[in-house]
Each structure stands twice: as C-alpha cells, then as structure tokens.
Amino acid sequence: MIPELGHLALILALCLALVQSSLPLVGAWRGDRQWMSLARPAAWGQFAFLAFAFGCLTWAFLRDDFSVAYVAGNSNSALPWYYKFSAVWGAHEGSLLLWALILGGWTFAVSIFSRQLPEVMLARVLAVMGMISTGFLLFLIITSNPFSRLLPQTPMDGNDLNPLLQDVGLIVHPPMLYMGYVGFSVAFAFAIAALLGGRLDAAWARWSRPWTLVAWAFLGIGIVLGSWWAYYELGWGGWWFWDPVENASFMPWLVGTALIHSLAVTEKRGVFKSWTVLLAIAAFSLSLLGTFLVRSGVLTSVHAFASDPERGVFILAFLLLVVGGSLTLFALRAPVVKSQVGFALWSRETLLLLNNLVLVVAASMILLGTLYPLLLDALSGAKLSVGPPYFNAMFLPLMAALMAALAVGVLVRWKDTPSRWLLGMLTPVLAASAVLAAAGSMYFGDFNWAVLAVFLLSAWVVLAGFRDFLDKTRHKGVLAGARSLTRSYWGMQLAHLGIAVCAIGIVLSSQYSAQRDLRMSPGDTVELGGYHFLFDGAKHHEGPNYTSDKGSIHVSRDGKEIATLHPEKRLYTVQSSMMTEAGIDAGFTRDLYVALGEPLENGAWAVRVHVKPFVRWIWFGGLLMGLGGALAALDRRYRVKVKTRVREALGLAGQGA
C-alpha cells in the first residue's frame, strides 16, 4: 500500500506542476493577480507530495519490501541500514526522484525567500520552474517509475546495491551534486522570466545572483566530494580522469563561474545583459546534458546508469525543447536590449569579460572532447578515445591565463583605472610573487618549470587579494576596515584563495607523486619517497555482507613508525563482486596510499604503493571555493527587503505583464 501511495503522490505532484507552470504565467500575461497567486501554493504542494513520495520509497528500502522492483534490484536484507537509505538514489529511478525532490525544494525556497519580488516576476519565475518539474515528473512517471511492483512473484531477497556504491560517498556526493545541477534552474528561470517581461536590467541579476552562488557552491563541493570518493574507493590513486560524466558536471560549473561574475557586472554596471542571460541558459542546459549522458545509455562509465533507448530519447527531446525554446526566446528578445554604459580597456568590466571568455572557451573545449567521440561513433561507427593528454594540453594553459588575469581583475576599478596607479599597485605584487615562487621552487630541490609557474601564479593571486584588502582598509585600520567589508567581498577572497590552493595541490601532487607496483610477501619492505613500508601479510575478515582479506602495512620514517595501513580486497557475496579498499594515511602535506592487487602464491600479494604530496590541497582548495560562494550569497544586500524599490527598478509597478 505504501508504494501505491508514493506513486499517487508523484501523480498529484505532476498535476500541481502543470498548474504552477500554466496558470501563473497566463495570470502574468493578463494581469490577473488571483491566477498569479496560485504559483506559491502550487509550489508548496508539489514539494510536499514529492517529499512524501521520497519518504515512501525510503520506507520500502528500510523495510526490505522486495515486492518493489527498484528495491529488489538495489538492496538486500544484509545491507547496513545507512546503505539502504543511500540506495534510494543509488540507481536510475531513485536518483531521478531525488532530482525531482531537490527541484521541488529549490522551487519551494524561491517561493518562500523571494516575497520581496514583484508578484508578476515571481509568478513567471515559478512558472518556468514548474515547466521544468513537469518535464522531469513526466519522465519519472512514464519511463522510470520507482514504485513498480514485482507481483505476484516476490523475490525472497534483493540483488544488493552495487558494491562500488556501498560507501559514505554515495550518501553525500549525489545530493550535493544534484543541489548544484538543479540549482542552476533558478538562474535559468530568472533569465527566462526577465526575457518574458522584456526587461533585462540590473534587478533580475541582483535577485538571481545569490541563488546562482549557492548552486555554484553546491556543485563545486559535489565535484570535490566525487573526486575524493574516486581517489580512495577505486584503488588507482588518481583524483580526476576526465571521465565523460566527470566532464558533464565540470562544464556547468565552469559556465556557472562565468555566470556569477557576469551577474556582478550586470548588477553593478548594467552591461553584459544579453550575455548574462545566455550564460544562465547555457549553465542549466549543460546540467541537462549531464543528465542525458548519464541516463541515455550512450556512455560506458562508472557513473552511468544502464538505461533503455526510450529513456534516452525522452531526455534528449526534453533537452532540445528546453535549449531550443529558451534560445528562440533569447533571439526574439535580446536584440532589443541595448547598453548605454561604456568602460575603458583597463577596467574591471574588461577583466571580467576576459574571465568569461576564458571560462567559456574552457567549457567548450571540454564539451568538444566529450561529445566528439560519441558523435563519431554514432555517425560512422568509428571508435575514438579522447583522454587526459588532450584535456590537460588544452585546459591547463587556459587556467594559467585565468589566474594571471584574476589578480589584475581584483585590483582594477569599475569603468576606468589610471594606468600609472594600476602599475604602482601591481609592481610590488609581482616582485613579491617572484621572490616567493623562487623560494618555493628551490625548497623542492630540482628546478621544475611547472612548479615555478604554479607558485608564481598562486602567489600572484593571493598577494593581489591582500594588496586590495590593504587598499580598502588603509583609512580605517586593519580591524575596523575588515569589519566594514561585505560578506560578498570576503567570499570572493576566500574563493580566489581556494583557486591558488587547488592549483598548488594539482601541480605538486602530479609532479612529485611516487608509485611502485610490486610483489610483497609477509616481512617484505620497500622504500618510497623517504618512507619505509613493511608488509605484515593479510588476514581474513568477515563484514556484514562481504568477506575480505585485510592487509597490514607498517609505515615508518627515520626509524619512527608513522602509521599502520589496512588495505582490503573485498568479495561482496550477493553479486560475487571483488572490490579494492585502499589503506590511506592522510596528512596536510602528503598522503600515504596502499592498495592490494591480486593474491599470489605463498601468502604474497600484488601491492601498489603511493606517496602523494599535497594531494589534499586539491580538495581543500575546492572546499574554500565552495565556502566562498556560500559566504558571498549571505551578503546583506541580498537580504534587504525593499519591495517598492525593486518594483521601480524593474519598471513593473502597476503593470500586469
């Protein structure tokens, strides 16, 4: 009975999504306040029904209701309860329900926290989000019903959750990623609402920017968590492989980065209006593209769900409808938007435009490398692999250029900057950066161009931010000046610091990582990176739904024991799947990483040993960026509720459409 109630809740949520997407939009066109007022209760009801449906599916998993096909295919009575909970979104149907729930949550949040918006603007925004919900709920109910029953024959037990997903990473990574993916629908909805209203001015940018910052922060942290999960779970010691589905999440993040900067220019200076709308459309369209790649069956990836062609066709049609419809509306409305505001070559507007171009080119390069092999295969049947050499060769120079421009962009002023003043600001920053880069490079011994470059660029970014802070607080004192600066400013500084930290981690871990693949018997030792690894053998271990051989490796340096690592080779009994669990000793400046390979004769094992310096800085930098975005979204000016002022800015007071 509970699964049937969940299915009914999905149908009712779809009905409310249809109401939300149509009547408020018609009301905005006709100037009918009663019809526009339906947007909020429809959004609330839709979210409530989606939450109820999600609760019903969770109940089915926790109660081992194997009469539900989705539960039988992705759970087992021996599965720990916390993995049963995360299994709710561990495969196609449940992950799509989570997507719909999060979209309903974003819609609910917009309806609650945007009361200061003019009613006509809010009605359009919620209507657009209702259209997106309608598409996903139709897809969910028609092709991917998570409540389908296996009747009259119900299995005694389930097939178990994919062993690769029986990890804490599944609990946190997909929800964070989906919060970012779906969050870009808010910026998309604001952009479409502005196009429908025919007014692309600073007001829509001001109100969509905090939502975009939060979505960008969630997506960035989700990507970081996915990288961390792959690093420790897959046993190969890497943190990024340019997998097509990794790329599918990275592309909207890059375009979203361009969007939050372009929104700032539109909000403060009233320029880049059409370009900002186009970025909002692109960011959400790339999120939908990621959904298509994961669920269409066109990819073979650890991230991809097995799927039938009907699902792929449905998502592709929805993607084309969203992209085609929004671009058509953009083509009709955007040409009439003109900006009378000018700016000089050396201005913040110019540097932010350069920022946007670099980020969009980077995303386009990744899009080309991701889709070209798929298109070639579809059109000619030829197989082509585009791997890390292509992406690294194209992406890294662009990021170096971005970091070089970033420091200048922080220091230049809006509209125009005297060149003599700018030179006086940049010269000491460049000199100090060169000194720090040389010192950092010498600390690591042998000269390395990549290391020198990353230290120079990172110091350039950090010191430019510090120089800007000193300039802004010079008349108030450091402490008083720091308190007077906005959260948006501190969020920017934190995010830029995260870029520098992440860049250092990427280069140092790639340049100085050491690895050995070898055969080790009990008592064997190996020296690597100044560390001494002693293999004590492996012992049999029984888990809740698996058996394993757990190794014991003692690590010492200069005669002092540092850690004992316990890598495992697990056999999950239900699916007879063998999995590798790495043994890791994490440190601020290095990771010691050991993975077991295959068992050999006489108690010996194939063992892979890594010493990975500064690898944690990659994820620490990513977290700093995400926290910076979240802090900027909490800026006081985004919470000021002055409804009349907003109406006047939008030019919508007293208008019906």
UniProtKB/Swiss-Prot annotation:
Q: What is its main location?
A: membrane
UniProt keyword Transmembrane present: yes
Q: Where in the cell is it found?
A: Cell inner membrane
Q: Which domain of life is it from?
A: Bacteria
Q: Write out the transmembrane intervals.
A: 8-28, 42-62, 94-114, 122-142, 176-196, 211-231, 245-265, 274-294, 312-332, 356-376, 391-411, 421-441, 444-464, 488-508, 614-634
Membrane topology label: Multi-pass membrane protein
- One of the record's GO molecular function terms: heme binding
UniProt entry keywords in alphabetical sequence? Cell inner membrane, Cell membrane, Cytochrome c-type biogenesis, Membrane, Transmembrane, Transmembrane helix
Q: Give the GO cellular component terms, alphabetically.
A: plasma membrane
GO terms for biological process, alphabetical: bacterial-type flagellum-dependent swarming motility; bacterial-type flagellum-dependent swimming motility; cytochrome complex assembly; pyoverdine biosynthetic process; type IV pilus-dependent motility
Matches recorded under InterPro entries: CcmF_C (IPR032523), Cyt_c_assembly (IPR002541), Cyt_c_biogenesis (IPR003567), Cyt_c_biogenesis_CcmF (IPR003568)
PANTHER family per the UniProt record, alphabetical: CYTOCHROME C ASSEMBLY PROTEIN-RELATED, CYTOCHROME C-TYPE BIOGENESIS PROTEIN CCMF
Functional description taken from the UniProt entry: Required for the biogenesis of c-type cytochromes. Possible subunit of a heme lyase.
Assigned protein family: Belongs to the CcmF/CycK/Ccl1/NrfE/CcsA family.
Q: What is this protein called?
A: Cytochrome c-type biogenesis protein CcmF
**Organism whose genome encodes this protein:** Pseudomonas aeruginosa (strain ATCC 15692 / DSM 22644 / CIP 104116 / JCM 14847 / LMG 12228 / 1C / PRS 101 / PAO1)
